[in-house]
Amino acid sequence: MEYKDPMHELLSSLEQIVFKDETQKITLTHRTTSCTEIEQLRKGTGLKIDDFARVLGVSVAMVKEWESRRVKPSSAELKLMRLIQANPALSKQLME
């Protein structure tokens, strides 16, 4: 059986607590930026929320969650949004 130093275990647990809080702060900051970007992107394309959802292959409710900052889109969804932003004609092709 492996001996575990109690002091080492305590310090390790404290580090996990401290770094967990830092990770959440970073995630929340990124999350806010992404969601604001999503709302701006959708409005910039001129698409209604239901058309934007259809282009991305998600529900209208999901787009509303992103825009209200309750849910973060996946990296694949973010990439598709950026492609649409770079090439607005792509959204029309995806709707066909």
Swiss-Prot record:
Pfam families referenced in this protein's UniProt entry, alphabetically: HTH_3 (PF01381)
Residues annotated to bind DNA: 49-68
Annotated signal peptide: none
InterPro entries: Cro/C1-type_HTH (IPR001387), HTH-type_reg/antitoxin (IPR052359), Lambda_DNA-bd_dom_sf (IPR010982)
SMART domains assigned to the protein according to its UniProt record, in alphabetical order: HTH_XRE
Keywords: DNA-binding, Transcription, Transcription regulation
Domain spans labelled HTH cro/C1-type: 38-91
Record-level Gene Ontology MF annotations: DNA binding
PROSITE patterns noted in UniProt: HTH_CROC1
Domain of life: Bacteria
Gene3D superfamilies recorded: lambda repressor-like DNA-binding domains (1.10.260.40)
PANTHER family membership: MERR FAMILY BACTERIAL REGULATORY PROTEIN, TRANSCRIPTIONAL REGULATOR
Descriptive protein name: Uncharacterized HTH-type transcriptional regulator YiaG
